[in-house]
Amino acid sequence: MRPIINEIINIIPTMSHEERTTIIENLKSIDSYDKIIDIIENHIESTNKCPYCGSNHLHKHGKSAGLERYMCQSCKKTFNALTNTPLTGMRKKELWLPYMQAMLDSKVLRKIKETININLKTAFYWRHKFSRLLYKDRPEVLNGIVEVDETYFRTSCKGNKILDKPPHKRGIHKAAKRGLSKDQVCVLVATDRGNHFLEFITGLGAVNGNWLDKYFLNHISIDSILVTDGHKSYVHFCNENHITHKVVKNHRNSTENNSYHIQNVNSYHSRIKSWIISVFHGVATKYLNHYLWWKHVLEDKVIKDS
């Protein structure tokens, strides 16, 4: 044991509670910093690709801000594991793991600010930086029996300084128009029986065939069985792309047997809406995608834990 360690051990009993707490928090920060650096460095070692040209001819090129830098032999550009990611330029790496844990706990910004001692603006900025990373965790393709249904969120300008429509006072007013309209944001959700989910913000108003072609076609295997309600857009989509289609006319009943229903996707709709409304009291439309990806990770964690 080094002499300095003995000195520290002898000094600690003479310290005040606040001083000991400060030392403990600093040690935790160092440990968290080392962990996040290891995670970041392992990422570049696993991918082994240049973020600019995709080449795997790399060699080490010194260190900066605690991170290894690399030079690509093909394009001669230098980079680190965070280059061209949403985390580029973010500081306080020792707080990243506590922040991500706070996101897994669905903590609101003010609670995060108090828990890990960062500025409220930083907490907001980081939320959307980390949320953008979550998009990569989505499955590429759904297989087998695939349930598809849409749900709707009222457009929201939450946080905007300048509104392009009259404000909704704390959500007490109803939507300006009855039923589906351009005041409603369509979110298409699909799931297969392997508990893989995909969510897409398709546009304003009712779902249509063009949106299905644009957002969904490349994410379903051609031999899948699509189970939907009777909306004509789904019928047209399946006919055009030669996909087997089962229609559930009554959400409480199946079409031919108990295998064909959309109960899983409708249950997911309920959980998304409950989470967004009860935890965040609604979110701005421009950030809705980020919250969908965030909820996706939370659902995936629940499935894996169970």
What are these regions (language model features)?
Residues 1-306:
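Residue-level recognition of single "structural anchor" positions
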